[in-house]
Amino acid sequence: MKLFNRKVTLVSLILMAVFQFFMALIIKRIVISAGTDENFIGYLSYTPSLNILLQALTIVIAATIVSMEFDKKTIKFLLIRPVKRQKVFWSKLITVVMVSFYLYLAYYILALLFGLLFFGTSVTAESKTLLVNTLALIGSNWLEAVMMGLFGLLCSSLFRNSAVAVVVSFVVLYGASTLVQLMKLFENKWGSFLLFANTDFTQYRSGETALFSGMTPLFSIGILIIHAIFFIVVGWWCFCKRDVRV
């Protein structure tokens, strides 16, 4: 796929490696200065706090994957091939999901490697519980990134301009995330139907309280499916049914 051959992909991987190195180094110095002990699982538990960087990369890639073809005037060359438009759209969608997965995989493999390098391999009973909770959080974060990617693909197909698609994606997605917190603050039950109220499945762990009363894991799965279908259908229609003008 062309996306994996773009310089931005290589640059992103290099930046992630550099970022993980300095993050591990800083946390190691903090641990030493505090006179405490830490292991690689403890370090790994810190890394999801910067999930916003991976989400941002996913949004940018998804929001430009179609619109970039219009910006570069290559969309007609893509569509004159003996392949139906819908197959091109599905290939773009699969690429977004795969790239998001590979970004997370690369990020956390690097986190694991630097965690082992700086903090060693010792594991305690508490560490195992922490690892399970961390993996659950990583899974929820990736699911949220995929949903953001689907919306970015919708914007990319709708606006057909990279700058507009990226800006709208960021404004709407992070605005919606803020709206969830506001509705939670005012205890508005309609907030439970918003996308970002349902992407964090760690809220259903034992001892945790759901964002809104009445929410269950099945409810959240249903809301996510509805949003995903809506994003995909609208994106598909914009890409497959509208006339191509460049």
From Swiss-Prot:
Signal peptide: none annotated. It comes from the Bacteria. The chain crosses the membrane at residues 7-27, 50-70, 99-119, 135-155, 163-183, 219-239. Pfam families: ABC2_membrane_4. Keywords: Cell membrane, Membrane, Transmembrane, Transmembrane helix. It is a multi-pass membrane protein. It is found in: Cell membrane. GO terms for cellular component: plasma membrane. Its main location: membrane. The keyword Transmembrane applies. This is Uncharacterized membrane protein YdbK.
